[in-house]
Each structure stands twice: as C-alpha cells, then as structure tokens.
Amino acid sequence: MITLNGQWKMKQVKEKEWHQGTVPGTVYTDLLTQGLIVDPYVGENEDEVRDLSYNDYLYEREFLISKEVLNNERNLLICKGIDTIADLLVNGKQIGICENMHREYEFDLTGFLKEGVNRIRVYFHSPMKYMQKLYEKKPLWGVTSTVPGYQY
C-alpha cells in the first residue's frame, strides 16, 4: 500500500503561485499555517476569509510507482473525506469525481499509472458556486439565515 498523505502543493486555480499543502487537511488550514490568511477562529475574522469558498483550488503531488506495483492485477486509489466537489486526475487523465465528503471513494487506477514518477491532481470546485448553480435549477426551502442552496 502506498499512502499519499503528507506534503502536497496547492494553489488557488486562478493564481500562479503554489504553496505547501498537507493531506489530510484543508485549504483554510494550509493558508493559515503559511500566514496567508487571518485566523478565522479569532474574533470576527471569519468574515474576512468567507469569500475564499468562492474560489477553486488545486492540490498536486508526485509519487513513485515501482514495476512490481505496476504489475499488480489492480491498483486502487481510496479517498476518504474529500470535501466536497472535486475532480481527480492521474497523469493528466480524469479518474473520477467526488461529490460528497461523507463517503469513501474507490478508483481503479489500472491503465492510468506508469513506472516511475506519477502525478495526481485534485481540482476542488467552489462549494458556493456549486450550491448556487443547483439552487438556481431547483430551489429548496430551508433556513433563511444561511446560504441559499446549502442543502446541496
């Protein structure tokens, strides 16, 4: 078994500069650790970082695959708690989509891996934009003091 937990690089999709990321972790934690945002848990700082959820983010890392691993009958990627809307790519090819952080995803990497250096990318779509888009298609009744579409 190979774990992909640990150090990744991450960035806001529309920016050029990459930052250090940690998996498991969160965008907010990674930005906070590097001093790129104020601590959202202090005072009313939450208001200052709220708009970050309207951005898309990219996490990426390289990992090595041996010939022995490549010759396995199957190689699976198991993802636990990807929050929330994400496309997963290995070596530039889409292997799957995640749409619910409260479940475990399993992706068969047969045919996607190569011997040597491989690259995985996780493209996180803005949860706010995702909710708004679904809400516009089918509005649902809910608590009025929160974000429209939160049910999605």
Residue map of PLM features:
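Accessory beta-strand-rich segments of carbohydrate-active enzymes
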Residues: 2-14, 27-34, 54-152
